[in-house]
Amino acid sequence: MKAAWYQKWQVHRRIRPEEFGGHLHNQMSELAEYDIHAELLTSPVLEIVYNQQESYLLPMAYAEGCPTHPAYPAGHATIAGACTTVLKAFFNENFVLPKPVTVGENGLSPESYHGASLTVGGELNKLASNIALGRDAAGVHWRSDSTEGLKLGEAVAISILTDLKATCHEQFRGLRLTRFDGTTVIV
């Protein structure tokens, strides 16, 4: 998290979607003037939102609204990227999950899964992505906050694993993992 907090406060200080929505609302209501691209200010979606909400603001998923710290990078995504990277380093990513199940149509009963093979690495990547992108849908982050947070967490984890490698007294042949971009790394 230290890497994410450094980027949030010392480098980027990016506003959150909720705050940008407030800027847009204030400009459309002629309460303030911001440097917002004309294409957005003339978008037909604004009239649709205003007619439904009686405001240019969209409802938030969280009653308390967004956190008050900067958006970029997403802390949840950074942690998810780091944890997933460490797990992929220690477990066989190519292991195929035997007899996977999916949720049945009633939402309660498990049914056999018959799609493509599910691997440990693929499922870990999906988990990290779900953790990262879930807060985008809630209006708390921009997509780039999450995708770059995953990459930052991955880089931090690889750096820590590399540092720890030097402290290993036993014969160590390295750890192999697949990065989120599909490239292979040997630590």
PLM regions: where:
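Hydrophobic alpha-helical bundle signature of multipass membrane enzymes
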Residues: 1-143, 147-187
